[in-house]
Swiss-Prot record:
Predominant place of localization: membrane
Protein name: Receptor-type adenylate cyclase ESAG 4
Cytoplasmic topological intervals: 1-32, 880-1235
GO cellular component: membrane
Residues that hold Mg(2+) according to the record: 905, 948
UniProt source species: Trypanosoma brucei brucei
Main function: Could act as a receptor for an unknown ligand.
GO molecular function, one term: adenylate cyclase activity
Cross-referenced Pfam families: Guanylate_cyc, Peripla_BP_A-cyclase, Peripla_BP_A-cyclase_1
Transmembrane segments: 33-53, 859-879
Length: 1235
C-alpha cells in the first residue's frame, strides 16, 4: 500500500523558488568524496557518473504539463457553489504554485460558458487533444446524468475523472476512469438509518423518493432490507412516477401524500431529486400539521436544492425555520471543524487564496468559509480533491503516458491528508491477491460519513454522534454492518444532586463502550441522557416510551419507574433501599439487598460476632429488618435491635458505642456523622449497602481517608477493585486501558463499564434488539460470562413455594451477582489491602428457624456422639474415600453454578463389534479404563455410561478441555495389540467413498507412516458444552444425573463430531480464561446447526492431535437419527411404532416376542436392556422405571427397527467389506447413518 502523507502543504513538493529543500545530488557526492581515500576517488567518481548520466537524461525530459478540465458545475447548482468548489481546488494547487514534484505543472482549463453541459465541455476539450499520451484529467463532473453521459468520452480518450459527485448507488460501479473520492450513496443511506434509530430514536421512520428519475430506487430497496433485518419497518412511503422529472398527476400525488401523512412518520429520509415533485412534496409537508415538524434527513447530493426548496415551502406556509429539523449526511468535515488537523491546514491555505483572488471569486472576506457553511463545505471538498490530485501526480514515472497513469492510480493507493484518509484503490488482481489483503477493482474512495444539521440563517453544525466510518477493507458498502441498536437511557434527576452525579459517573463509565460510528457489532450500544425529576420520572419515561425507541434504562431509578412495562431495566440503582421483587423486566447484576445481607451475615459469623444492631431508613424498613434477622439467624448471629429511622433524622444518636451496626438508608449528612463516630469509637463497626456507598463514595473517601475508621466501614461487592493497577481482573484492566483519568476510577464508573461490556457480549449474539429480546436473553442463557464477570442464574420459571425458600416468588430469579466479597473502606482506598472475605455466591436458602431447636444437654450429647462416630469412621478407613469423593460432591450438588459436560462415543462401534467380536471386548474395556483414569486425574465426575458412551461432568471448563485433549493423545499412543481396528476404519471410509463420489476419505489413503503418527486404535468423538443443569440425586444408585438444555447441547455437539475429533461450543470456549485459551489450539468452525436447537451454535474444534484432518461434520447423519432422543444417554419420547417395520424388522420383532413371551415384564426388561445399550436404542420416556407389557412391546419394536435397518442394508450391499457376524452383515455406511 502506497501511504502518501501530506502533513505539510509543501511536504515532498517544491517550495517557492522551485529548489529542492533536501540536499542536492552534487552536495551529496562532494560530501561522500571528501571522506574517501584519494586512491578510491577516481573509480568511485566514474561509477557515479555511469549511474547519474541516465538519470540526467530522464530529468531533462521531466518537465511535464498536466491539463485539468474543470467540469464542476451543473444547471441546478447556483453560481456561488460552483465558485466555492473550484476555489477550494485552486487553493490547494496555488499553495504549490501550480507545480507538483518540482517539475509537474498543472494547467486548469475552465469552461467559457456555464450554460454548456459538463459532458459537452468534456467531449469538446478531449477532441482538441492531439497527443493521446499527454496526461489530461477531468475535475468533476457533478450529477448522475452528466457522469453517465461523460463515460464514453472518458473511456475513448483514456482520461480519468477526479472528484466527481454522484447521487445514486447504481452509477458507483467499477470503472477505472471514474475516480470517486466521496463515500458512496449506500453508505450515506446506512448512516441516515443509523442516525434515525440510534440517535433520534424515532419509532416511525418514513421514506420519500420519486420513480423514473434514476435516483432513490436502490436506496429505498436498501432501506427496506436493512430495516427488516433489524426488526423494523418503514411507517409511510411516499413515491410517485415522475418520468425524467415530469410532474405526477395531481390527484394521484395528493392521494399518495394523504396515505403517507396518515402513517405519522416522525422522521423522513428524503431522496428527492431536484425536480418539481420534490418541491411539491415539501410544500404539502410544511402545511400538514401531522408531519410539518418531522425530521427531514437527506444525503449530501441533494442538500443544496433541498435547502432552497424547504425554505420556499416554509415561506409559503408562513412557518418559521426549526433549527435541527433538517439533517444531511456529508462526505467531508465543515470548514469550521477545526478539531481536524487537515481542516486547520485548509483554513490557512484557503484564507491566503481568498485574499489574493478577490477578483476571481468575488469574495472579500478571508474567513468567508467560516461564516458560510454551505460554500465552506464545498471549498473543503475542492481542497481535498486538489490534495489527492497532487499526491497522484507526485511521481514522474507515473506520468509517462495515460495508460501508465491510470494503472498507477490503482496500484494499491491510499491518500492520507493529515487526519483525513481517502482510499483504498486497487485494480485488477492476479491469483489469490484478494485473499491476501489486496484491494481489487475498487475506485470508491472515502469510508467516512458525517452528519450535519441545519441551523438558522443557512448555518450548519456537525453532529459528532452521527459520524460513521465503514470498514476500509470492503470496497463497496456492506449493509450487513448495520445492526439493530440497543437504545438505552441514563436518568438524570435534576432535583437530586447525588442521583445526578451518580448518573454522570455511570454515563462516563460506559462512554468508552457506546457506539462511536465504527459500523459493526461494536456500534450497537447507545446511551442517551434522560432529564427528569424524582416525582415525574415514571410519567416522563412513559411519555418518552410513546415517542422514542427505549430498549433499556440504566443507572439511578425510582421505584415507580420499575413498573413501566415493555422496558428492560438493567441493574437499576434505586435511590432508597428496597427488597427485591421479581419483575421479569428488571435485571439485577449487582448484589441485591438480600444477597448483600446474606453475604455480610456469613462474614460476621466467620468474624465471631454474636449480635448486631441495625438502623434502617426506608419505606420497607420492617421487611428489611425481617430479612436481616433471618440472614443473621441462618449463620447463628442475633439481631439485638432494629431501629427504624425517619428521613432527615440524625443517624449519630442511633449508633452504639461499640459492636457492629447495619446502617441502611443513607443521606449526605450521615457520611460525616458515621466517619466521626468511627473515629471516636474504636470498637464500632458500621456496615452499609453497596448501592448507597457507591452513590456517596466521594464523600466517604474524603471523610475516611487516612483514618483508622476506614478499616471499620464495611460493605459487600462483586466488582473488581476500580483503583487496582496491578489487578488480574480483565474487566479492571480494560477499564484502566480506556479511562486514563484516575479521578474517575470510582465504584459507579467500573460498575457501568462492566455493564457495558456485558451489553456488548449480548449484542454479539442477537441480530434484532428490543426490550423483550434483551430480557429474554438473560432467562434463556441463564448464566452469562463477560470477561471475568459471571452473572446468573436468571430464571423466570414459576416454582411451587417450599418451606426452605424465603423468596415469595419461589424459583423465579431476576438477580445474577456472583463472587461477592466483603470489603472495608480501607481496601476501597488502598487496593493492596485484601478483602475481608473470599468471594462467594450466596445460595439464598434458609433453614426452618423453628425446627430442630435442642436443649444444651442434648447438644452436648450430640457433640460427644459425633466425636465417637468420627473416630470410628477414621478407624474404618472411610475418610480417604470421602476425601476422594469431595470433588465429586462439589461438582454434582451445586446447580446454581455452570458445569461443563463432556460426552464421548466410539465411532462406528456397532460395525466394529460386528466385524471384530473377539477384539472389541478388550478394546472397550481399555477404552473405559483410560477414560476413567483421566476422570480421576482431572477431578471430574462420571455421570453415567451407556454402552461405550461416557457422560462426564467437570466444575472446571479447562479441566474438561484438558481431559478431552489427553484422551485423544492416550488413545493415539496406547498399544492396542492389533491393527484390525485401524484396518476396519479405513475399510469403512473406502466403502463410503465408493458409494458417495463427493466423499474424500480423510485417513484411508494416508501413507502408513503418516497414518501411524496421527491415528491408532479406537476413534472417540468428544463434545463439550458449559452451562447450567438441573442436578438430581438418584436414590437407587446414590449418584447424580444432569438434565436440561446443557446436557442436550453437549450430546448434540458430540453427535456431529467425527471419530478422533473434539468439538466445543462457544459457551465452553468462552468459559475459559484468556490465559487458558492461549494454552490450547482451536479452530473456529462458525455456526453449526444442531437438531433440536432453534439457532445454529458457534463451534470450535480442539486440535488435540496436530495434523489430523476430518470429514465435514456429521450434520446430515444426525438428521437421519430423528427417531432417537436428544442425548445418547437419556430416554426418548419418540416411538418406533410411529413407523412401519420392514420385513426383516418384523421377523426380528416376532422372534423376540416369541422368546420373551413367557417372561414376566421385569424379566423382559432385564433381558432387553443389554440389547438397547449395545445397539444404541433409546428408551421411550413413557416406560418409566418398571416396564409394563406396552412398554416392553415398544422397546421390542425399537430394537427390531434398528437391527432391521442394518439387515436391510446388508441385503442391498452383499459386497460389503466388513465380515458377517451371526447372520447380520454390517457396513460402515449403515453404522454412520445409525450412530
Amino acid at each position: 500500500m502506497n501511504m502518501l502523507h501530506l502533513s505539510d502543504r509543501n511536504a515532498s513538493l517544491a517550495p517557492s523558488g522551485g529548489e529542492h529543500s533536501l540536499p542536492t545530488g552534487g552536495a551529496v557526492c562532494r560530501d561522500a568524496m571528501d571522506i574517501l581515500p584519494v586512491i578510491l576517488r577516481a573509480p568511485v567518481a566514474l561509477l557515479l557518473l555511469l549511474v547519474v548520466l541516465p538519470q540526467l537524461s530522464v530529468g531533462a525530459e521531466a518537465n511535464v504539463t498536466v491539463k485539468v478540465l474543470s467540469a464542476t458545475w451543473n444547471w441546478y447548482m447556483p453560481r456561488k457553489y460552483v465558485t466555492a468548489i473550484n476555489a477550494g481546488f485552486n487553493a490547494s494547487l496555488k499553495s504549490r504554485n501550480w507545480t507538483v514534484a518540482g517539475s509537474v505543472n498543472v494547467q486548469v482549463v475552465y469552461p467559457s460558458n456555464l450554460d454548456l453541459m459538463p459532458e459537452d465541455f468534456i467531449k469538446k476539450q478531449l477532441e482538441l487533444e492531439t497527443d493521446q499520451n499527454k496526461i489530461v484529467i477531468v475535475y468533476g463532473p457533478l450529477g448522475d446524468k452528466s457522469v453517465m453521459h461523460s463515460i464514453p468520452h472518458l473511456m475513448n480518450h483514456r482520461v480519468v475523472a477526479f472528484g466527481l459527485i454522484t447521487g445514486s448507488t447504481f452509477i458507483r460501479q467499477w470503472n477505472p476512469y471514474l475516480y470517486f473520492l466521496r463515500a458512496d450513496p449506500a453508505a450515506e443511506t446506512l448512516v441516515l438509518i443509523r442516525y434515525s434509530l440510534c440517535q433520534l430514536r424515532v419509532l416511525r421512520l418514513g421514506f420519500m423518493y420519486l420513480q423514473g428519475v434514476h435516483y432513490g430506487d436502490e436506496e429505498y430497496a436498501l432501506t427496506v432490507n436493512v430495516m427488516s433485518r433489524m426488526g423494523y419497518e418503514l411507517h409511510g412511503v411516499f413515491t410517485v412516477m415522475s418520468p425524467d422529472g415530469k410532474p405526477a398527476p395531481d390527484a394521484e400525488f395528493k392521494e399518495v401524500f394523504e396515505r403517507f401523512a396518515t402513517a405519522l412518520p416522525q422522521a423522513i429520509i428524503v431522496f428527492g431529486a431536484p425536480v418539481d415533485d420534490t418541491a411539491k412534496f415539501l410544500m404539502m409537508m410544511a402545511v400538514d400539521e401531522r408531519i410539518a415538524r418531522s425530521y427531514i434527513l437527506s444525503p449530501s447530493s441533494v442538500q443544496l436544492s433541498l435547502i432552497e426548496m424547504w425554505q420556499l415551502a416554509l415561506e409559503a406556509a408562513g412557518a418559521s425555520f426549526a433549527p435541527g429539523q433538517l439533517l444531511f449526511t456529508g462526505t467531508n468535515p465543515l470548514a469550521k471543524d477545526s478539531q481536524y488537523t487537515a481542516i486547520k491546514r485548509f483554513q490557512e491555505v484557503m484564507s491566503e487564496y481568498l485574499k489574493a483572488h478577490v477578483g476571481e471569486t468575488n469574495i472579500t472576506e478571508a474567513d468567508y468559509f467560516l461564516t458560510h457553511d454551505l460554500e465552506g463545505e464545498l471549498m473543503v471538498y475542492g481542497w481535498i480533491s486538489g490534495e489527492v490530485l497532487s499526491q497522484a501526480l507526485s511521481n514522474l514515472e507515473w506520468l509517462k503516458d495515460r495508460a501508465t497513469f491510470v494503472r498507477s492510480l490503482y496500484d494499491q493507493r491510499r491518500y492520507v491528508i493529515n487526519d483525513i484518509v481517502i482510499g483504498d484503490y486497487g485494480g485488477t488482481c492476479e491469483g489469490d491477491a484478494a485473499k491476501h489483503g489486496a484491494t481489487c477493482e475498487c475506485n470508491q474512495g472515502s469510508k467516512a460519513v458525517y452528519v450535519k444539521e441545519m441551523l438558522e440563517n443557512g448555518q450548519k453544525t456537525s453532529v459528532r454522534s452521527g459520524f460513521t466510518v465503514l470498514k476500509a477493507s470492503l470496497c463497496y458498502t456492506d449493509s450487513s454492518e448495520l445492526h439493530g441498536p440497543l437504545d438505552g437511557l441514563v436518568v438524570f434527576m435534576k432535583d437530586d444532586d447525588i442521583a445526578s452525579k451518580a448518573a454522570a459517573l455511570w454515563q462516563k463509565g460506559t462512554s468508552h463502550l457506546v457506539g462511536k460510528g465504527d459500523l459493526g457489532y461494536s456500534d450497537r450500544f447507545f446511551l442517551h441522557a434522560f432529564n427528569t425529576t424524582i416525582a415525574e420520572a415514571a410519567n416522563d419515561l412513559r411519555r418518552d416510551q410513546g415517542e422514542r425507541i427505549v430498549t433499556a434504562v440504566f443507572g439511578p431509578v425510582t421505584e415507580a419507574m420499575l413498573d413501566t412495562p415493555n422496558i428492560t431495566f438493567i441493574d437499576p440503582l434505586e435511590l432508597k433501599p428496597r427488597l427485591n421483587k421479581f419483575r421479569r423486566n428488571v435485571i439485577h447484576l449487582s448484589p441485591t439487598l438480600e444477597q448483600q445481607l446474606y453475604v455480610l451475615s456469613s462474614y460476621l459469623a466467620g468474624a465471631g460476632v454474636g449480635n448486631v444492631d441495625a438502623v434502617i431508613c426506608s419505606n420497607e424498613a420492617d421487611g428489611i429488618a425481617d430479612f436481616l434477622r433471618s440472614s443473621l439467624t441462618e449463620f447463628a448471629v442475633s439481631l439485638r435491635s432494629a431501629v427504624i429511622r425517619e428521613d432527615g433524622e440524625d443517624v449519630g444518636k442511633y449508633l452504639p458505642m461499640s459492636g457492629t451496626v447495619f446502617v441502611i438508608g443513607l443521606s449526605v449528612p450521615d457520611v460525616k456523622e458515621i466517619a466521626r463516630k468511627l473515629e471516636e469509637r474504636n470498637d464500632l463497626r458500621v456496615i452499609v449497602l453497596f448501592g448507597e456507598f457507591s452513590f456517596l463514595y466521594d464523600l466517604f473517601a474524603t471523610a475516611l481517608n487516612n483514618t483508622a475508621g476506614a478499616a471499620r466501614l464495611v460493605f459487600a461487592t462483586s466488582l473488581p477493585h476500580w483503583g487496582d493497577t496491578e489487578t488480574s481482573s480483565k474487566t479492571a484492566q480494560l477499564f484502566h486501558d480506556v479511562e486514563k483519568d484516575s479521578r474517575l476510577w470510582t465504584p459507579l464508573s467500573v460498575l457501568a463499564f462492566a455493564t457495558g461490556r456485558l451489553m456488548r457480549v449480548i449484542l454479539l449474539h442477537v441480530e434484532e434488539m428490543s426490550p423483550e429480546t434483551l430480557v429474554n436473553f438473560f432467562y434463556t442463557d441463564s448464566s452469562i460470562v463477560s470477561d471475568d464477570m459471571r452473572y446468573g442464574v436468571f430464571d423466570d420459571t414459576k416454582c411451587v413455594d417450599t418451606a426452605n425458600k424465603l423468596s415469595k416468588n419461589g424459583c423465579a430469579s431476576n438477580y445474577g451477582a456472583t463472587q461477592i466479597s466483603v470489603w472495608s473502606m480501607a481496601r476501597a482506598l488502598n487496593a493492596s489491602i485484601p478483602p475481608l472475605t473470599n468471594p462467594m455466591t450466596p445460595s439464598m436458602t434458609f433453614r426452618n428457624s423453628n425446627a430442630g431447636r435442642i436443649s444444651g444437654a442434648s447438644l452436648v450429647g450430640i457433640i460427644i456422639g459425633g466425636a465417637l462416630a468420627l473416630f470410628l469412621v477414621v478407624a474404618l478407613g472411610v475418610v480417604p474415600y470421602f476425601f476422594l469423593r469431595n470433588t465429586v460432591i462439589t461438582i454434582c450438588t451445586k446447580d446454581d453454578r455452570p458445569v461443563t459436560l463432556i460426552f464421548t462415543d466410539i465411532e462406528s462401534s456397532t460395525a466394529l463389534w460386528a466385524a471384530h467380536p473377539e477384539v472389541m471386548p478388550d478394546a472397550v474395556a481399555t477404552h473405559h479404563r483410560l477414560i476413567r483414569t483421566l476422570i480421576s486425574k482431572y477431578e471430574c465426575y462420571e455421570v453415567k455410561t451407556v454402552g461405550d458412551s461416557f457422560m462426564i461432568a467437570s466444575k472446571s471448563p479447562f479441566a474438561a478441555v484438558q481431559l478431552a485433549q489427553e484422551l485423544q493423545l492416550c488413545f493415539l499412543h496406547h498399544d492396542w495389540g492389533t491393527n484390525a481396528i485401524d484396518e476396519s476404519y479405513q475399510q469403512f471410509e473406502q466403502q463410503r467413498a465408493e458409494d458417495d463420489s463427493d466423499y474424500t476419505p480423510p485417513t484411508a489413503r494416508l501413507d502408513p507412516k503418516v497414518y501411524s503418527r496421527l491415528w491408532n486404535g479406537l476413534r472417540v468423538r468428544v463434545g463439550i458444552h458449559t452451562g447450567l443443569c438441573d442436578i438430581r440425586r438418584d436414590e437407587v444408585t446414590k449418584g447424580y444425573d444432569y438434565y436440561g438444555r446443557t446436557s442436550n447441547m453437549a450430546a448434540r455437539t458430540e453427535s456431529v463430531a467425527n471419530g478422533g475429533q473434539v468439538l466445543m461450543t462457544h459457551a465452553a470456549y468462552m468459559s475459559l480464561s484468556a490465559e487458558e485459551r492461549q494454552q490450547i489450539d482451536v479452530t473456529a468452525l462458525g455456526d453449526v446447526p444442531l437438531r433440536g436447537v432453534p439457532k445454529p451454535v458457534e463451534m470450535y474444534r480442539l486440535n488435540a492431535v496436530p495434523g489430523r484432518t476430518f470429514s465435514v461434520l456429521r450434520l446430515e447423519l444426525e438428521l437421519l437419527n430423528d427417531d432417537e432422543d436428544q442425548t445418547t444417554t437419556s430416554c426418548s419420547d419418540h416411538s418406533s411404532s410411529r413407523t412401519d417395520l420392514s420385513v426383516a424388522a418384523q421377523t426380528i420383532a416376532a422372534s423376540l416376542q416369541s422368546l420373551l413371551g413367557t417372561f414376566t415384564p421385569a424379566q423382559r426388561q432385564k433381558a432387553l436392556i443389554p440389547f438397547c445399550e449395545r445397539w444404541r436404542v433409546p428408551l421411550p420416556q413413557k416406560v418409566g422405571n418398571v416396564w409394563d407389557d406396552d412398554g416392553c412391546q415398544e422397546v421390542v419394536r425399537r430394537v427390531a427397527a434398528k437391527v432391521g435397518r442394518v439387515m436391510d442394508f446388508g441385503t442391498r450391499k452383499p459386497s460389503s467389506s466388513v465380515t458377517s457376524w451371526k447372520g447380520v452383515e454390517v457396513s460402515s455406511q449403515v453404522e454412520e447413518r445409525l450412530l
